[in-house]
């Protein structure tokens, strides 16, 4: 209440920010006459002079903002025939400051982005504009590219159609690059699998503007991007697990928690599964794979629905994106879930894959020095944007007031009654000539409504993942008189639905929602399709107690209200109280998802630090100037120490107790070098260690000395990279296993997150030691051919080319299964003067707190 009074007197923080921006808008408007007078050539020259000042550091971007915005607006008037409104100038400033601009549908977000893009591209470090699909990326790059070209910029566009790396690289070299979140993310992962700097396509992460930022940074945050390849761990138990899952009875053998999407076997279920598998203990170590298969088979059969979560087409299971309703072709669920769905549907089961590289959108977008976003709906998730990405949400006023009427929800007892009422309402609107856009939450419901409308002979267009090719065209026509469009929640974001004067007279576009989504934001997006730029319009949701949201999260309370009111079949209730109860249920789901995403990030942050360390070292290895010789010397000394301890020889061991026979054998087995016991006799620990290091180095130098310096360095780098990549892939597999089983630690009164951090750190240290040891072993065992010094390099390069081609051919880009994790535990960041958690022994402020790991691990690479 006090907050409300304060806001009335002083205005909200958002109001104060808007006032601050309005002062600068006045200054930009004051510059308009000055730039209007200039010829095209003079205008281009003025912008180029401004750009050079920013590029050379004579002027900051913020100092150049007013002139840059004024010139960009003038150029837009001339090239595109569009003048930026004052509210669009505010939007541009919000984006430039690295915030999220919440702008209603039809307020011209695409044009707003040009202001911040043109200003931020002045540093020549590249600007990425991220959209939700290839169609929008191509459309915006083509349309806005004309404006950028006038200003002297080059514009590129990355789509899934561009397969050639050099062509992709060319697009990234442009001043401004448009593309989808998937393409940017996968290019980053692929770049970190390359064996030459020339093949890397991206050129850093300077500034990104994310269009439909809520969809990309929130809806898709729970599904990681994964590049996977075939694994030799081929398993053929999917069909068996599917047969068993189908024989188990719900509630008797297992319980289903739809709220958390979890299935748990009962004691009776475990006994039945053990009997059917023919094993004594389903949860013993040797049967862990069977238990995992059964878990995935149960999920596939009882949590995943055909035509809702996936479709079957041409003998393939294709994922339906739950947020956009589009088919995610080429993507596969991970951890054997996709194979379980294939077994369920009786289609050919494709080989299980192994993760080669993965990252979440949360961690990919946090790579950018500056990040900004635009959307029509962000305030409901303002807390999440702030906590996870450090992004503030600013609501931009509309250019014209919104006059759309948002009517109260109508609630029916059954789904059948609801759809009968929906068809009746559509018929009524169609006869009147008022266009209606009907929103459904799944393909299944979409097609059900399609059949009902067909039966009533109501002409209509259908838009879902199965008919998405003409998406933009269908949506653009949805505002015509008498048009009826039935769409899943993909609903053509980014495409305006325009109406004419006749339709305005009829009341504008009518939005009819057939079910509430789990997120209020997606409902608001649907409402926002109507009433753009001050147009009339209306929106209303028709619900039933059988809808998923009400059934799982809040049906009982509403059911009681309906029973008390004595609602008969076919009747509905329409009340503010019920609408509030529905919103309460949505808030509960949103909070649950927020906690889940936050928790996933805590887990992924552990893997992310490891990923950054490995990728940083990989980048160093790719640099031809990298001092690989020092790295090999350093690793050799560490490997010698390990071989000594392997032979039970330690600094405190008396020299007479040294097991030199074992040491001699270990050195020959591991490094292929024969050193006799006599040569090592009568030496103290340090003397013996130094003798071995020198002897191994001498032999290695004699062998590699045959090569020219450049050839030698190339062989060493390539071999080191191969060892690193193989070890990293194996590590990712181990991490997957760890993540799958870590939740069980909670039953042992242990915090799963703390345990995960501990175990993953141990795995990472093992990885680091394995890389060092394997690299030294490989380099010492390599045999050079005498005929021609270049032969070895040629052989390695051919092998490498084959390997890369194989990875490219076999790798599958996919979204992982939505990750489910344990309850949230807050992670405390170390204080500046505390010891660094990486184990370097330094204070946090002098180590990782400064600029990433410095010591030990792989960071000693420059030694």
From Swiss-Prot:
<dbReference type="Pfam" id="PF01043">
    <property type="entry name" value="SecA_PP_bind"/>
</dbReference>
<dbReference type="GO" id="GO:0006605">
    <property type="term" value="P:protein targeting"/>
</dbReference>
<dbReference type="InterPro" id="IPR011116">
    <property type="entry name" value="SecA_Wing/Scaffold"/>
</dbReference>
<dbReference type="Pfam" id="PF07516">
    <property type="entry name" value="SecA_SW"/>
</dbReference>
<comment type="function">
    <text>Part of the Sec protein translocase complex. Interacts with the SecYEG preprotein conducting channel. Has a central role in coupling the hydrolysis of ATP to the transfer of proteins into and across the cell membrane, serving as an ATP-driven molecular motor driving the stepwise translocation of polypeptide chains across the membrane.</text>
</comment>
<dbReference type="GO" id="GO:0005524">
    <property type="term" value="F:ATP binding"/>
</dbReference>
<dbReference type="InterPro" id="IPR036266">
    <property type="entry name" value="SecA_Wing/Scaffold_sf"/>
</dbReference>
<dbReference type="InterPro" id="IPR004027">
    <property type="entry name" value="SEC_C_motif"/>
</dbReference>
<keyword id="KW-0472">Membrane</keyword>
<keyword id="KW-1003">Cell membrane</keyword>
<dbReference type="GO" id="GO:0065002">
    <property type="term" value="P:intracellular protein transmembrane transport"/>
</dbReference>
<dbReference type="GO" id="GO:0043952">
    <property type="term" value="P:protein transport by the Sec complex"/>
</dbReference>
<keyword id="KW-0479">Metal-binding</keyword>
<dbReference type="GO" id="GO:0008564">
    <property type="term" value="F:protein-exporting ATPase activity"/>
</dbReference>
<feature type="binding site">
    <location>
        <position position="88"/>
    </location>
    <ligand>
        <name>ATP</name>
    </ligand>
</feature>
<feature type="binding site">
    <location>
        <position position="847"/>
    </location>
    <ligand>
        <name>Zn(2+)</name>
    </ligand>
</feature>
<dbReference type="InterPro" id="IPR036670">
    <property type="entry name" value="SecA_X-link_sf"/>
</dbReference>
<dbReference type="Pfam" id="PF21090">
    <property type="entry name" value="P-loop_SecA"/>
</dbReference>
<feature type="binding site">
    <location>
        <position position="496"/>
    </location>
    <ligand>
        <name>ATP</name>
    </ligand>
</feature>
<dbReference type="InterPro" id="IPR044722">
    <property type="entry name" value="SecA_SF2_C"/>
</dbReference>
<keyword id="KW-0963">Cytoplasm</keyword>
<feature type="binding site">
    <location>
        <begin position="106"/>
        <end position="110"/>
    </location>
    <ligand>
        <name>ATP</name>
    </ligand>
</feature>
<protein>
    <recommendedName>
        <fullName>Protein translocase subunit SecA</fullName>
        <ecNumber>7.4.2.8</ecNumber>
    </recommendedName>
</protein>
<dbReference type="InterPro" id="IPR001650">
    <property type="entry name" value="Helicase_C-like"/>
</dbReference>
<keyword id="KW-0067">ATP-binding</keyword>
<keyword id="KW-0547">Nucleotide-binding</keyword>
<keyword id="KW-0997">Cell inner membrane</keyword>
<dbReference type="GO" id="GO:0017038">
    <property type="term" value="P:protein import"/>
</dbReference>
<keyword id="KW-0862">Zinc</keyword>
<keyword id="KW-0811">Translocation</keyword>
<feature type="binding site">
    <location>
        <position position="836"/>
    </location>
    <ligand>
        <name>Zn(2+)</name>
    </ligand>
</feature>
<dbReference type="Pfam" id="PF07517">
    <property type="entry name" value="SecA_DEAD"/>
</dbReference>
<feature type="region of interest" description="Disordered">
    <location>
        <begin position="818"/>
        <end position="842"/>
    </location>
</feature>
<dbReference type="Pfam" id="PF02810">
    <property type="entry name" value="SEC-C"/>
</dbReference>
<dbReference type="InterPro" id="IPR027417">
    <property type="entry name" value="P-loop_NTPase"/>
</dbReference>
<dbReference type="GO" id="GO:0031522">
    <property type="term" value="C:cell envelope Sec protein transport complex"/>
</dbReference>
<dbReference type="InterPro" id="IPR014018">
    <property type="entry name" value="SecA_motor_DEAD"/>
</dbReference>
<dbReference type="InterPro" id="IPR014001">
    <property type="entry name" value="Helicase_ATP-bd"/>
</dbReference>
<keyword id="KW-0653">Protein transport</keyword>
<dbReference type="GO" id="GO:0005886">
    <property type="term" value="C:plasma membrane"/>
</dbReference>
<dbReference type="InterPro" id="IPR011115">
    <property type="entry name" value="SecA_DEAD"/>
</dbReference>
<feature type="binding site">
    <location>
        <position position="848"/>
    </location>
    <ligand>
        <name>Zn(2+)</name>
    </ligand>
</feature>
